[in-house]
A protein has these predicted regions:
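N-terminal maturation segment of proteins
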Residues: 2-249
Length: 249
């Protein structure tokens, strides 16, 4: 907002600043220097509830502020739209134990490694640390899946089984992106080879355990219906399109 930082700018910063620590993946995806990228968010119900609490208090503070000019009003609207939707999804039970074959924690935890810097030994040391953190992240996620089974919304069985297949791919060294990543680093920094390979094996076995967990613990409680339903679809289309869509057109 033209050089001068407004109260709304400050609030926005006060939300995003702790986010880089609460969500190391966020720090990685926006390339924030100085944030620790060797770990993961807390994917458990408690961790997700804390995130929602931060969003909720930020929105409450936003309601107390008056934009000083047009730019400021645009900033406020953008923040309110983004955070309001996140909160709505959380309250509808959509964030806890989210599972699908494209953009759920199963893929996010895997894909974040593609965005990590790989130039220095320090970078690879961070990658090794994050590989050993995969199991903890997936344990939190399993708790959330069980919470979702207990309180809904229903989980489509087809998604569960296809996600289990994705986990199988990540488990086996022949196909695992974790294995390839470790070997790439080991070739450049032999002194980190042991840490990287150990981290990769940890991550692979964590995904192997998740595959079994999905088949044994979650699939029996999942629904054969894949339908999303009008209200849920509207929320998700807003999430991806950034606007409310008139679905009845």
């Amino acid at each position: 907002s033209g050089g001068m930082s407004t109260a709304i700018d400050e609030l926005s910063n006060s939300y995003f600043h702790p986010l880089q620590h609460r969500s190391p993946e966020f720090a990685t995806s926006v390339g924030l220097p100085g944030a620790d990228q060797g770990t993961f968010s807390d994917y458990s119900p408690a961790g997700i509830a804390e995130d929602a609490e931060l969003i909720s208090s930020t929105l409450a503070q936003l309601d107390e502020l008056t934009p000083v000019n047009d730019d400021d009003a645009i900033s406020a609207d953008a923040l309110r739209e983004r955070l309001g939707l996140q909160l709505e999804l959380f309250e509808a039970g959509e964030i806890t134990g989210e599972i699908n074959v494209i953009a759920s924690p199963i893929q996010e935890i895997r894909d974040i490694f593609d965005l990590m810097p790989t130039d220095t030994a320090e970078d690879w040391h961070t990658i090794a640390r994050r590989l050993t953190s995969v199991a903890t992240a997936l344990d939190g996620y399993k708790e959330s899946l069980l919470a979702r089974v207990a309180s809904g919304p229903a989980i489509p069985k087809r998604q569960v089984l296809r996600c289990a297949e994705q986990c199988d791919t990540l488990k086996d060294s022949a196909s695992s992106s974790f294995h390839k990543l470790a070997e790439t680093g080991a070739a450049v920094f032999p002194e980190l080879a042991d840490d990287l390979r150990e981290g990769a094996l940890d991550a692979q076995s964590a995904y192997g355990e998740l595959a079994a967990f999905l088949r044994d613990e979650i699939s029996p409680h999942a629904t054969d219906k894949d339908a999303v339903g009008h209200e849920r679809y509207q929320r998700f289309s807003r999430l991806f399109l950034g606007a409310a869509v008139d679905l009845d057109e």
